[in-house]
């Protein structure tokens, strides 16, 4: 008989999405499932929908609890699971019908206890999903022992987005429970990575499939990076310190691991600084300057910047040089120019594609809301190969 796989789904005010999510799990080719829906004190009709779904399928168990956040909901779900394997899904996403089967097959075939799949990023729709040719795609992208994986952890953090989330992974339940691995409940951002990092301590190997088995639905295209996160720097520093300690403990904090993790952290520090210019930030200009000064003078930041000399774009390099010289006022002034300059004049911006856009330019959409009251126009000049076009935004 197939091993039992437990799927934990935290639910909070997801009445628009939860049915599609759970239905996609119920339709799995792999049938031996335990689906645990953890209602985290929802104020909409999500609890009722969850209960109705449980009446339709005996594999579904619903837990209702007071609101405590996504980490709390996942931890409660972990306490209830009885399966051999453990997986997670977010209530506003949907999964491919082979999501569970392929992950289990890889775990059993390669005898590893951590399997990772890739995913699709879908904006506001379930319609743009192209069926996968599973016969062609069922090959691992790579397979590594845990020691091999430790040696490339910095690279995986920096260049592989599959490292951070829990929903594209298959875990062994006994490892999670025996070592009391939980999601930190005192973090608003990045808690998933700390769970994964703790699990890596005890896994024997890691494998990744190229199949995009998970569909990550972005309900608001601006929500991923445009939200103001007051504790972004503190959370990112916590992740960096945890990863650095992990590398030191396993004697792999050297070579490219050092440069890659330093580059990862430096980019997050820059994001934290730019985040201070969000229109939701209620700090005064003086307090914002002081906060930027605190970030730039942080010892961890200074160390990371000194090693992060690889892969940098021109603007990143410019800001990195300023950070190394602790020129925090110049950083503040330069970022202020990015923000204020758009309000006062057209911005002609040249880039080949979004991935290669200068770092600060990625954040220009943050200013769109703030300039509406000025009635100004922004002209974007986008270049893709030899094709050029202008976009006017009001």
Name these PLM-found stretches.
Residues 91-233, 237, 250:
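Donor-binding/catalytic cores of nucleotide-activated saccharide
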Residues 25, 40-41, 54, 68, ...:
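Conserved short acidic donor-positioning loop in nucleotide-sugar-dependent glycosyltransferases
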Residues 65-81:
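Glycine-rich, basic loop-to-helix element that forms the pyrophosphate-binding segment
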Residues 39-48:
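A conserved acidic beta->alpha catalytic loop
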Residues 278-394:
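Membrane-interface aromatic/basic loop that binds lipid-linked glycans or pyrophosphate carriers
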Residues 86:
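Short aromatic/hydrophobic "clamp" motif used to bind/position activated sugar donors
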Residues 1-27:
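N-proximal low-complexity "stem/linker" segments adjacent to membrane-targeting elements
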Residues 211-220, 226-252, 268-303:
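Catalytic core of nucleotide-sugar-dependent glycosyltransferases
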């Amino acid at each position: 008989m197939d091993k039992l796989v437990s799927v934990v789904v935290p639910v909070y005010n997801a009445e628009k999405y939860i049915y599609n999510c759970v239905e996609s799990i119920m339709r799995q080719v792999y049938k031996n499932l335990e689906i645990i829906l953890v209602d985290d004190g929802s104020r909409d009709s999500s609890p009722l929908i969850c209960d109705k779904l449980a009446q339709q399928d005996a594999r579904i168990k619903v837990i209702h609890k007071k609101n405590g956040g996504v980490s709390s909901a996942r931890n409660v779900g972990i306490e209830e699971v009885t399966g051999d394997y453990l997986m997670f899904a977010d209530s506003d996403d949907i999964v491919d019908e082979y999501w569970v089967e392929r992950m289990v097959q890889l775990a059993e075939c390669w005898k590893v206890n951590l399997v990772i799949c890739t995913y699709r990023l879908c904006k506001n729709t379930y319609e743009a999903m192209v069926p996968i040719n599973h016969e062609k795609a069922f090959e691992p992208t790579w397979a590594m022992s845990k020691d091999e994986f430790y040696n490339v952890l910095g690279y995986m953090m920096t260049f592989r987005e599959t490292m951070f989330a829990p929903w594209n992974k298959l875990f062994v339940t006994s490892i999670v429970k025996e070592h009391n691995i939980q999601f930190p409940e005192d973090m608003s951002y990045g808690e998933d990575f700390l769970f994964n990092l703790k699990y890596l301590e005890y896994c024997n190997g890691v494998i990744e499939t190229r199949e995009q088995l998970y569909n990550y639905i972005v309900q608001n295209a601006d929500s991923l990076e445009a939200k103001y996160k007051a504790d972004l720097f503190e959370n990112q520093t916590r992740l960096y310190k945890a990863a650095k300690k992990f590398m030191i403990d396993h004697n792999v904090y050297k070579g490219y691991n050092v440069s890659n993790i330093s580059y990862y952290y430096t980019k997050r520090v820059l994001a934290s600084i730019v985040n201070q210019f969000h229109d939701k930030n209620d700090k005064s200009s003086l307090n914002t300057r002081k906060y930027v000064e605190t970030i730039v003078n942080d010892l961890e930041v200074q160390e990371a910047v000194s090693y992060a000399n690889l892969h940098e774009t021109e603007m990143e390099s410019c800001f990195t040089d300023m950070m190394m010289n602790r020129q925090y006022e110049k950083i503040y002034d330069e970022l202020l120019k990015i923000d204020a300059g758009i309000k006062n004049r057209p911005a002609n911006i040249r880039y080949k594609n979004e991935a290669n856009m200068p770092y600060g330019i990625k954040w220009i959409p943050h200013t769109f809301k703030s300039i509406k009251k000025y009635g100004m126009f922004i002209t974007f000049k986008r270049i893709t190969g030899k094709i050029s076009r202008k976009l006017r935004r009001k």
